[in-house]
């Protein structure tokens, strides 16, 4: 975690960089992207995929997953020490889809992890290129965020399913480093901490001995990451209390749930990055585009530009709507699962609808699904405008919000009111201000009550024409605030299952 005074931008976290200037950052992010692209090209050659098959998002996901699994040291070690029936710890693979005689066929492939690591390193000038691996993890995480609701996980940790807007990055592995920590929502950090505390309550030895010491360090580090996301002194002080606790237990769980609730109004700073599938980077590199020389940013115009000029295909099940599948992937590409739908619609230039109204299931195809009836179609991932991604939660104010999701987490730095349903949120805060954190709780509640409806967030920030790469002329959109803005509104999205 960067200490005070050495705040690094996401791009620096993304590329493990020390302090760099803007040009160096753009170059190192570009280098990371071209490494992913070169790796993807090589894998398509190895697998003898046609151009169309190489641009199929399902094939991209399998290839990305293979390299992530090949580099998952802890799991590899675990698999070697606990051999399970029918699983070769040295191999990795998945489904590859090919077009044969006018039909889609599924082929299960298996590769040596060592071989995949060799191809990856070769594509990345001999480096392990951890930044590129993390980038792919964040893309998978963003896809999960747009596809699934985490209701069950929220309920299991004692949180409210309506707090889903705080759950960005909830499926990111712990090993995703600083870049991963930056994109995790407040709810995600709270959930990780609660799980840890609950294990400590049930297992007497959890905090003891050499292992316990390591656990404690991890606990405090996670608290520090959470603290860094809060923007008010009272919230930060309360995280300090949780971190300093001698023997974390139910009181800390209560405090953490309180903090998570407060983040619905007093929003945390959560980074947003546009991470695209490898099948976008591959063809761009193959066409001769030099990412490292041109430079690249995950939070500017570059991903929008890249998507304007990319062809990506997806398998479509018999009763799915290709336009809806496109929306799902568009949201994932821009990490916009918890953004206000009005803002997303304006930028995309087509209406973005709530999850429950989408006629599409996830992008991945289960191994038992019938391939006979599978079609494929082009994903429409282009946009009308572009906007800078945000790393702050914006300031807070009150608007009508929905029954399913009662707050949003902004993705795009665009002037607007940030909707939340104050009465619903505040109802959860009645009477519970006793105990050692009482003064902080009182202060946080006061701050929440005084959050004003008229406050406009991201003052003067707008969207930009795709021809305006220097972001010179912002267009500040006006939004109809009487409409519904939440994606998971009164929703029936599938649950995420590990």
UniProtKB/Swiss-Prot annotation:
Is Ribonucleoprotein a UniProt keyword of this protein? Answer: yes
The UniProt keyword set, sorted, is: Capsid protein, Helical capsid protein, Host nucleus, Host-virus interaction, Ribonucleoprotein, RNA-binding, Viral nucleoprotein, Viral penetration into host nucleus, Virion, Virus entry into host cell
Q: Quick one: a GO cellular component term?
A: host cell
Pfam families in the record? Flu_NP
| Keyword Amino-acid biosynthesis in record | no
SUPFAM superfamilies noted in UniProt = flu NP-like
For this chain, one GO molecular function annotation is: structural molecule activity
* Locus of motif Unconventional nuclear localization signal: 1-18
**What is this protein's function per UniProt?**
Encapsidates the negative strand viral RNA, protecting it from nucleases. The encapsidated genomic RNA is termed the ribonucleoprotein (RNP) and serves as template for transcription and replication. The RNP needs to be localized in the host nucleus to start an infectious cycle, but is too large to diffuse through the nuclear pore complex. NP comprises at least 2 nuclear localization signals that are responsible for the active RNP import into the nucleus through cellular importin alpha/beta pathway.
**Assembly notes:** Homomultimerizes to form the nucleocapsid. May bind host exportin-1/XPO1. Binds to viral genomic RNA. Protein-RNA contacts are mediated by a combination of electrostatic interactions between positively charged residues and the phosphate backbone and planar interactions between aromatic side chains and bases.
Q: Which family is it part of?
A: Belongs to the influenza viruses nucleoprotein family.
Q: What is this protein called?
A: Nucleoprotein
């Amino acid at each position: 975690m960067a200490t005070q005074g050495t705040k690094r931008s996401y791009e620096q976290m993304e590329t493990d960089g020390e302090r760099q200037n803007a040009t160096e950052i753009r170059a190192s992010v570009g280098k990371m992207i071209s490494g992913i692209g070169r790796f993807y090209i090589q894998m398509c050659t190895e697998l003898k995929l046609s151009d169309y098959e190489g641009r199929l998002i399902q094939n991209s996901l399998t290839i990305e997953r293979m390299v992530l699994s090949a580099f998952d040291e802890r799991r590899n070690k675990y698999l070697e020490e606990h051999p399970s029936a029918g699983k070769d710890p040295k191999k990795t693979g998945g489904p590859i889809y090919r077009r044969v005689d006018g039909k889609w066929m599924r082929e299960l492939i298996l590769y040596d992890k060592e071989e995949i690591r060799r191809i990856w390193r070769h594509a990345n000038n001999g480096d392990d290129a951890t930044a590129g691996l993390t980038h792919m993890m964040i893309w998978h995480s963003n896809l999960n965020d747009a596809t699934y609701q985490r209701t069950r996980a929220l309920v299991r940790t004692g949180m409210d399913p309506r707090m889903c807007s705080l759950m960005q990055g909830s499926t990111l592995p712990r090993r995703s480093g600083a870049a991963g920590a930056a994109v995790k929502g407040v709810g995600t950090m709270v959930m990780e901490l609660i799980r840890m505390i609950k294990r400590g309550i049930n297992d007497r030895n959890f905090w003891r001995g050499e292992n316990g010491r390591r656990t404690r360090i991890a606990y405090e580090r996670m608290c520090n990451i959470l603290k860094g996301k809060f923007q008010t002194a009272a919230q930060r002080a309360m995280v300090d209390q949780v971190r300093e606790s001698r023997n974390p237990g139910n009181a800390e769980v209560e405090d953490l749930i309180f903090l998570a609730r407060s983040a619905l109004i007093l929003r945390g700073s959560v980074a947003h990055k546009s991470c695209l599938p490898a099948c976008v980077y591959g063809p761009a590199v193959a066409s001769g585009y030099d990412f490292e020389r041109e430079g690249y940013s995950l939070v500017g115009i570059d991903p929008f530009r890249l998507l304007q000029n990319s062809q990506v295909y997806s398998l479509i099940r018999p009763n799915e709507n290709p336009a809806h599948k496109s929306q799902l992937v568009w949201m994932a590409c821009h990490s916009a699962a918890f953004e206000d739908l009005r803002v997303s619609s304006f930028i995309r230039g087509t209406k973005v609808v709530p999850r429950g109204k989408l006629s599409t299931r996830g992008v991945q195809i289960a191994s038992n699904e019938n391939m006979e009836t599978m079609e494929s179609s082009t994903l429409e991932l282009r946009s009308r405008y572009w906007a800078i991604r945000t790393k702050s939660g914006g300031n807070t104010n009150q608007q009508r919000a929905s029954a399913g999701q009662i707050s949003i987490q902004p993705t795009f730095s665009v002037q607007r009111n940030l909707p939340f349903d104050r009465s619903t949120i505040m109802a959860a805060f009645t009477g519970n201000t006793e105990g050692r954190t009482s003064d902080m709780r009182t202060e946080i509640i006061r701050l929440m009550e005084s959050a004003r409806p008229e406050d406009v967030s991201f003052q003067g920030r707008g969207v930009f024409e795709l021809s305006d790469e220097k972001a010179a002329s912002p267009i500040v959109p006006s939004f109809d605030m009487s409409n519904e803005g939440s994606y998971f509104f009164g929703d029936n999205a599938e649950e995420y299952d590990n």
